[in-house]
Regions:
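Acidic, low-complexity/disordered tracts enriched in E/D and polar residues
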Residues: 1-40, 110, 349-446, 491-499
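Conserved SAM/SAH cofactor-binding pocket of Class I
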Residues: 124-217, 223
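Long, charge-rich, low-complexity alpha-helical segments
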Residues: 34-86, 131, 135, 140-146, ...
Length: 499
């Protein structure tokens, strides 16, 4: 409904925290001011004062809402009112499930306000970001299996728990939070849903000894000098909250279970982000994919989160808060903050394997990476079973969305024309991975066929035709192909049907 009523520009304005632009879009849209659609968007989402008759059009009798403070009468006109809570629709990505409504406190995106210490956030960028990387689970995949046991740690207003519970028929969700107020909001979204157990408690204490098939968490990972806002900050120093969640989530995974977590890591000049996060992951029985989406300097980080809190960093309060926060970082030598996802899968009888990758390339707006997350583990498990010989003795398929890019730049030496600069294999879908290759690798990828020759036969034939040493060529090719498979540019024929 939001995109329909607001249109693309109005919807973008809403997401950017530009209420004036969003209001203009709805006022100049196709829906009359007395329509239900207009009331839902202008009144509920954009928080405009509207006549009580319009509120009755969507809520019926509004006396109870006024008495409870959900609606508040305008101070200048008792026949008009505005909403005091946030109600947003959200749906699972990668499925055709219906939207659910999430109820929470209002943030500062549409109206000027500073969140209270017990503020309960709603459908914001963090849960939407995590939903965009969660692998979809279809009922067909679960047919004949026990219900999927899901833990939403630190559920807040229940975005992740409610979406997961309503997306599939065979799930049992445990949703925990330290805040009883947050759980009260969460129950509003789907109070009668039998498959959600709302539990109050700190971190993993409410689920001690329990194992889950799926763990999701958008924990309070903001790194700051105090814990004034419980929804985003904790008493744990620096990245202690992220570390705790990663370490303990691994302990609560059932065999083959997966965890998908938002996390942040504080870095000094001497720190390696890969080494730091790898140190949080147990040494046995875990395969992990850590994806760093952002790396920001501490000045940018502090400004971002003070603005999120509704603090004007130009004000005297904002200037003091900024200085205190930066002093906190500099006292520990912290210069940058990394943020991203930690994906883990429980294995058995193996040493843990951690892959850390930087995914800072621009992606298409709305890109859904849930399928990529699931496929990454399938590709990693396939690679784990191979050696250099079996990699060469396999047939491969080029990904349907694979592009071969020829990059030329102006020829400064001649002063005219262009000269070859780079040759790249790039995915035009999902994470948009791109690998620079030479003409030999490009030629081999052009020649692979899932029903044709093995990679070894293709490479040896190419080497013979082009006067290359066959053994040296295939030996050099194997690790390159491993990297191409890891990023899904080419796929082993024997797992294509599984993906």
């Amino acid at each position: 409904m939001l995109t329909t009523v607001l249109g693309p520009e109005g919807y973008a304005a809403m997401l950017a925290g530009n209420p004036a632009g969003a209001v203009w879009a709805v006022d100049h849209g196709d829906y009359a001011p007395d329509s239900v659609e207009y009331t839902c968007v202008a009144g509920v989402v954009l928080r405009r004062d509207l006549p009580l008759d319009q509120w009755r059009g969507i809520y019926g009798d509004v006396d109870g809402l006024l008495a409870a403070g959900v609606l508040e009468a305008s101070p200048t006109d008792a026949t008009r009112a505005h909403i005091t809570v946030d109600i947003r629709p959200v749906a699972a990505r990668g499925t055709e499930s219906a939207e659910v409504l999430i109820v929470s406190d209002q943030d500062s995106s549409m109206t000027a306000r500073t969140p209270a210490p017990n503020h309960v956030p709603g459908v914001g960028n963090a849960p939407l970001s995590l939903l965009s990387v969660l692998p979809p689970v279809s009922d067909a995949q679960r047919a004949g299996s026990p219900p999927l046991r899901v833990l939403d740690l630190g559920t807040g207003s229940g975005v992740l728990a409610t979406v997961l519970a309503t997306s599939h028929s065979a799930v049992e969700v445990t949703a925990t939070d330290i805040s009883s107020r947050a759980l009260g909001f969460a129950r509003c979204a789907f109070p009668q849903h039998a498959s959600i157990d709302w539990v109050e408690g700190s971190w993993f204490e409410p689920v001690e000894g329990q194992l889950f098939d799926l763990i999701v968490s958008n924990p309070p990972f903001v790194i700051g000098p105090d814990c004034g806002l419980s929804y985003r900050e904790t008493p744990l120093d620096f990245d202690g909250a992220s570390r705790l969640v990663v370490e303990q989530a691994a302990q609560h995974l059932a065999n083959h279970g997966t965890a998908h977590l938002l996390a942040a890591w504080a870095l000094t000049e001497a720190d390696s982000a890969a080494s730091k996060v790898t140190g949080w992951i147990p040494g046995e029985d875990i395969r992990a994919w850590v994806v760093q989406r952002d790396l920001v300097d501490i000045t940018t980080y502090v400004h971002t989160w003070l603005t999120d809190e509704g603090i004007d960093t130009r004000s005297s309060e904002g200037i003091k808060r900024t200085a205190d926060w930066l002093d906190y970082f500099m006292g520990a030598g912290i210069t940058h903050i990394g943020m991203g996802y930690v994906h883990m899968k429980r294995t058995t009888g193996t040493s843990s394997e951690v892959t850390f990758e930087v995914m800072d390339q621009a992606l298409q707006p709305g890109t859904f990476l849930g399928h990529e997350t699931r496929e990454w583990f399938a590709r990693a498990e396939w690679l784990d079973r191979q050696d250099a010989h079996s990699v060469l003795d396999t047939q491969y398929a080029a990904r349907p969305t694979l592009a071969l890019e020829h990059v030329s730049v102006s020829d400064g030496d001649l002063g005219v024309g262009f000269k070859d600069y780079a040759l790249r294999l790039s995915r035009t879908d999902g994470p948009a991975w791109s690998h620079e290759v030479d003409q030999h690798v490009a030629a081999i990828v052009k020649g692979i066929n899932p029903d044709g020759l093995t990679l070894r036969d293709t490479a040896e034939l190419y080497a013979a035709v082009n006067g290359l040493d066959g053994d040296a060529f295939t030996d050099a090719l194997a690790p390159i192909v491993v990297d191409l498979v890891r990023h899904g540019l080419i796929l082993p024929a024997d797992i294509v049907e599984e993906l």
